[in-house]
């Protein structure tokens, strides 16, 4: 409908221009055509350029999905195209979802009202470069990171591989991060700019103590700085860092600037990291994390834990016990998988070391989510993540017990329209129901 109305407007405008053109061009010679009609041609050119620019500023434009994405996939490496996308979003030249979210998509959790249940998982905006640009794609929740205390380059390149027949990727980035200080500086600069525009009387207070001005009640918006949209900060550890202190330092550094904190103990690309999912180690870590979180200025951000999809039922039962004991606010299921399902069609890159994401991950992550939901206290929400690229996928996660969902790989294949597409497909599947009505309601 959007494309039809847009091109109908173009056609009508050109028709009117054509009438004027015909009335003034009769008898003119080819030699002085442009001189005689430069004003008319300028109007037509400006009009056409304006329409094209407006069209490209909307995530629904066919240009993004039908032209840009295939070109990127054909002529660039995955990591290069990822970097270009982040740069474009950071410069504010990426499109926006211009359709208001239907109220039936809203979900309230941790005392926060999300305008829709679709988030963008950590790993896309690792260095907090493009918070506003990515949220403008139509997501209600963005996780930056994973962020490590000290800068580290991650694993050597190449470390990101497309499995095109499976619409999947394998990555072994290895927590490449510019470190706490650099990322905190970016976030504080963004908040200061917002305060200067909306509440300049707070600038002196902010400059003296930035953390004192980040209460959403003071800002008037969440810490994402966008109404009904939220900023998560995903915390990791350095390759040779301290298993407890790295996360505690992350809570201390970012707790007053995040709507949500996520403890990532599940990346397969940092040696030994997944050992932190074991009952004793996880309990020790989360006890320290929650204690540090409780020292922050109020309101305290909820603490979530991101776990792997490769855990067995005994391990998931242990994790459920720890989450309840440590009073953790939520859990994300899950990260990438080290498994290589037999359903994979790709022949190249399949044996690369790293975590697999995309549609082949979905049945693995869904099974993990269902198993955890059986053992997890009902008051601890789950965010589902893994292979989600359609409204049907999202609804399958919701019925399995996910309060919200996240996408990652689908953004790289479908482009900026993905959040809009999933939301519209959810609405079609809901058939008048609300998202919250189907959570945990298996058919």
UniProtKB/Swiss-Prot annotation:
The compartments listed are: Mitochondrion inner membrane
The record's section on Gene3D superfamilies has: Aldolase class I
Please name the PROSITE patterns in this protein's record.
DHODEHASE_1 (PS00911), DHODEHASE_2 (PS00912)
Q: Where is the transit peptide?
A: 1-21
EC number, as in UniProt: 1.3.5.2
Q: Which EC class is the enzyme in? A: oxidoreductase
Functional pathway = Pyrimidine metabolism; UMP biosynthesis via de novo pathway; orotate from (S)-dihydroorotate (quinone route): step 1/1
Which amino acids does the record list as binding FMN? 122-126, 146, 234, 264, 306, 358, 387, 408-409
Q: Does the keyword Ribonucleoprotein apply?
A: no
What's noted on cofactor binding?
Binds 1 FMN per subunit.
Q: Which SUPFAM superfamilies does the record match to this protein? A: FMN-linked oxidoreductases
Named cofactor requirement(s): FMN
Query: Which protein are we looking at?
Result: Dihydroorotate dehydrogenase (quinone), mitochondrial
Q: Which organism is it from?
A: Schizosaccharomyces pombe (strain 972 / ATCC 24843) (Fission yeast)
Taxonomic classification: Eukaryota, Fungi, Dikarya, Ascomycota, Taphrinomycotina
């Amino acid at each position: 409908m959007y494309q039809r109305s847009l091109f109908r407007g173009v056609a009508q405008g050109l028709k009117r221009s054509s009438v004027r053109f015909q009335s003034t061009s009769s008898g003119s010679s080819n030699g002085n055509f442009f001189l005689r009609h430069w004003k008319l041609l300028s109007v037509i050119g400006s009009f056409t350029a304006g329409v094209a620019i407006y069209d490209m500023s909307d995530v629904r434009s066919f240009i993004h999905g039908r032209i840009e994405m295939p070109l990127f996939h054909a002529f660039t490496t995955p990591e290069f195209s990822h970097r270009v996308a982040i740069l474009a979003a950071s410069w504010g030249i990426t499109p926006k979802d211009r359709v208001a979210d239907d109220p039936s998509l809203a979900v309230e959790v941790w005392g926060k009202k999300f305008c829709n249940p679709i988030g963008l998982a950590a790993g896309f905006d690792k260095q907090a470069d493009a918070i506003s640009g990515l949220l403008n794609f139509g997501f209600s929740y963005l996780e930056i990171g994973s962020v490590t205390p000290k800068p580290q380059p991650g694993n050597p390149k190449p470390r990101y591989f497309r499995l095109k027949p499976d619409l999947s990727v394998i990555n072994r980035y290895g927590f490449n991060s510019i470190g706490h200080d650099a990322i905190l500086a970016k976030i504080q600069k963004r908040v200061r700019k917002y305060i200067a525009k909306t509440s300049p009387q707070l600038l002196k207070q902010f400059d003296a103590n930035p953390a004192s001005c980040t209460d959403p009640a003071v800002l008037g918006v969440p810490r994402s700085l966008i109404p009904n949209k939220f900023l998560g900060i995903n915390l990791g550890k350095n390759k040779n860092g301290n298993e407890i202190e790295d996360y505690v330092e992350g809570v201390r550094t970012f707790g007053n600037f995040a709507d949500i904190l996520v403890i990532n103990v599940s990346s397969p690309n940092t040696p030994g990291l997944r050992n932190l999912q074991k009952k004793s180690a996880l309990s020790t870590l989360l006890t320290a994390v929650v204690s540090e979180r409780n020292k922050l200025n109020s309101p305290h951000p909820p603490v979530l834990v991101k776990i792997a999809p490769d855990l067995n039922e005994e391990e998931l039962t242990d994790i459920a016990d720890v989450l309840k004991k440590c009073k953790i606010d939520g859990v994300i299921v899950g990260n990438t998988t080290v498994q290589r399902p037999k359903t994979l069609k790709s022949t190249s890159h399949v044996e690369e070391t790293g975590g697999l994401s995309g549609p082949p991950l979905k049945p693995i992550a869904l099974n993990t989510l269902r198993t955890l939901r059986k053992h997890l206290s009902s008051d601890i929400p789950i965010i589902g993540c893994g292979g989600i690229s359609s409204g049907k996928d999202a609804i399958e996660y919701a019925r399995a017990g996910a309060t919200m969902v996240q996408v990652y790989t689908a953004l790289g294949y479908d482009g900026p329209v993905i959040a809009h597409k999933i939301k519209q497909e959810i609405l079609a599947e809901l058939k008048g129901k609300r998202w919250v009505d189907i959570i945990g309601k298996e058919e």
